[in-house]
A protein has these predicted regions:
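A short, N-terminal "cap"/entry segment at the start of jelly-roll beta-barrel domains
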Residues: 1-32, 36, 115-116
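Short, conserved beta-strand element in jelly-roll/cupin
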Residues: 39-41, 51-66
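Short acidic-glycine-tyrosine-enriched beta hairpin
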Residues: 70-85
Length: 116
């Protein structure tokens, strides 16, 4: 590959980061976005929060109950939820759940290890 910023990432070579006892993740970051694999055990709760990134959450396995801007939304396997920049949201795993998340701009707080 050329030296034009092209980079191949292999998920199996990226360390799994334990966020809590119930949530873990792996992520890669480009210039403008972060791509994350997130694993949530059934019953896991990510408290209400907001961030400077637009978020797309694609549920590959399991299901999530999300409270987004006061609205209760269930996101199931095969579904994608878009959360605009700055919108408060909370997550609860209804099952053992595996999601792919895309964030833009990048999650600098994750890189700096200062945010969930």
């Amino acid at each position: 590959m050329s030296d034009a910023g092209v980079r191949l990432h292999r998920w199996d070579e990226i360390a799994l980061e334990k966020v809590t006892e119930m949530v873990s993740r792996k992520f890669v970051t480009g210039d403008r976005e972060t791509l994350a694999q997130v694993y949530l055990k059934r019953g896991a709760v990510v408290p209400r929060h907001a961030h400077a990134s637009e978020q797309m959450t694609y549920v590959l396995q399991g299901a999530l109950r999300m409270l987004v801007d006061g609205e209760d939304v269930t996101v199931r396997e095969g579904e994608v939820l878009r959360i605009p920049t700055g919108v408060a949201h909370q997550v609860e795993a209804l099952d053992d759940t595996f999601v792919l998340g895309v964030f833009s701009p990048i999650r600098q707080d994750w890189i700096d290890r200062t945010g969930e």
